[in-house]
């Protein structure tokens, strides 16, 4: 049976995974390293299920390059592939791309009560839904021309506006000078007739473009007031290419719904410590299993999936936050992982170097597989 690969990794398929694992003795999944259908970013798998077998129960995953390799596949290779123990739960099946030692390490970590999910220290929520970004999000030139500066706040609309693990006033000003749309129009919460002239003029312009007739705007009492305008402590990316990112907010900015907003639950742990702690091989490895990839190479997270990520937290440490931020801006993530893994996972949590190397390998294996599927 040919099915979408979402079977592996989405919550709404959880009951299907449980049914398959309970009903069949052995499940074989054949996957492709490259996308196999023209013109769509959809990953598919072949699902082969067997019932009432005497032995060798479980699940195995066989990878082939493309349809050509599938046509010439040696079925002995399939029969000789390792059959792994199948966890009869709602857990995602992405982990079965790993070998047995890697799977067992992840299971060991999940039962380690020292390592808690992100939800213990942060709430994650979606960003602002403006209803019409072209109207509400402005660049510096437009703001100046229409004299709207007093009626704006800072906003981030794309992940590439972030360069490091902190978004500060200097970053904002650079984006502003580049004429990026980093100003959000927020007129006073008043009826149109009582608004300042600059706001009335701009709102009138929006109505000539029929922006107020769009669904999201039309259901508001005052269409020009964007709801949920709170400023987060940090941002996490909804979609990532290389690795999951948590960015401290030091620019008093909010974000659109392409970027999730984070509130920290405690003042006992500094934002800098949380941001540094996020950059470790354990959290990165679990991110590839917790998030979802639909075939285009991008890893996607809903707020609840970020909250589920295991996040070991640094205790007292001497890691230089500014140095790590600089390395991230230089795209030297491996060097950052070396620094944080050494302090957090090895020194503080007493993981062995072999275990940390395995976790790094899991992240690289799964992220490499994901990004390799960007094209046929």
Predicted feature residues:
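Signature of N6-adenine DNA methyltransferases within the class I
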Residues: 1-131
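Amphipathic alpha-helical segments in well-structured domains
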Residues: 13-17, 255, 376
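Generic structural signal for hydrophobic residues
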Residues: 16, 199, 274, 340-341
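Non-catalytic, mostly N-terminal accessory regions of nucleic-acid modification and defense proteins
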Residues: 31-36, 147, 207-211, 215, ...
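A structural detector for beta-sheet-dominated domains
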Residues: 33, 62-65, 186-188, 265, ...
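A general structural signal for short secondary-structure boundary/capping elements
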Residues: 48-50, 64-66, 75-77, 232, ...
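Non-catalytic DNA-recognition/assembly elements of restriction-modification systems
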Residues: 89-93, 97, 103-136, 198, ...
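Polybasic, glycine- and aromatic-enriched phosphate-binding surface used to engage nucleic acids
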Residues: 102-317, 323-326
